[in-house]
Regions:
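Single conserved hydrophobic/aromatic residue that forms the stacking wall/gate
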Residues: 1-13
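Gly/Ser/Thr/Ala-enriched C-terminal appendages of enzymes
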Residues: 14-196
Length: 196
């Protein structure tokens, strides 16, 4: 048994493995708990919609000078899109919760911050899986927790759908997260209304 400890970081571990180090256990400790490269969590809850008395959601938006901090309005869900032939991840698509898609039809994906960057997925060449799963509805738990073994197997299967380029520790390729046309149009409309 070979153990390496004392403030190990992912780059050091990667380099040691690439160099053929015969280490069977890593003592990561502090660097497992607190990322040295990104010590703060950037996720913050923001108001996206207000539900009226009729149960309809009125989209709301938070505007910022920083384009990445402008929120996506409305009651949303997200779909993971896979290549039908290879099973590999193509992109994630954020859309309104009431939007539906037909995988037999062409799907145009575009970068919401650079809309000229487009990818057309021909109908029949992709599959979609909704990522958001209801946990509570009307105060009742609707979710059956999987076992640890089931969670581990699910994670293994999902990891297999990632391209090697996205799993690199240094300079990884991004997994695309796009907006549906309907969500993009609503966001643009709210931004334009706010500046008039």
């Amino acid at each position: 048994l070979h153990v390496r400890s004392r403030r190990q970081r992912q780059m050091c571990i990667r380099d040691s493995k690439m160099q053929g180090a015969a280490i069977s256990s890593w003592g990561v400790g502090t660097n497992l708990i607190t990322s040295k490269d990104c010590p703060s969590f950037g996720g913050v809850y923001k108001l996206a919609a207000i539900q009226n008395a009729d149960g309809e959601f009125q989209p709301k938006i938070k505007i910022s000078e920083n384009i990445e901090k402008i929120t996506n309005p409305g009651n949303k869900t997200i779909y993971r899109i896979y290549d039908k032939e290879t099973g590999m991840l193509r992109a994630d698509l954020i859309c309104f919760a009431d939007e539906t898609f037909n995988t037999g039809e062409d799907l145009l994906l575009f970068d919401p911050n650079a809309t000229w960057k487009k990818t057309l997925l021909p109908g029949g060449t992709y599959t979609m899986r909704e990522l958001l799963v209801p946990i509570f509805q009307h105060g009742e738990c609707k979710y059956e927790s999987p076992s640890v073994k089931e969670i581990a197997e699910f994670c293994r299967q999902e990891k297999e759908t990632l391209w090697d380029e996205t799993k690199r520790l240094f300079n990884p390729h991004k997994v695309y997260v796009d907006l549906s046309q309907k969500l993009y149009d609503t966001k643009t409309k709210l931004l334009n209304e706010a500046h008039h």
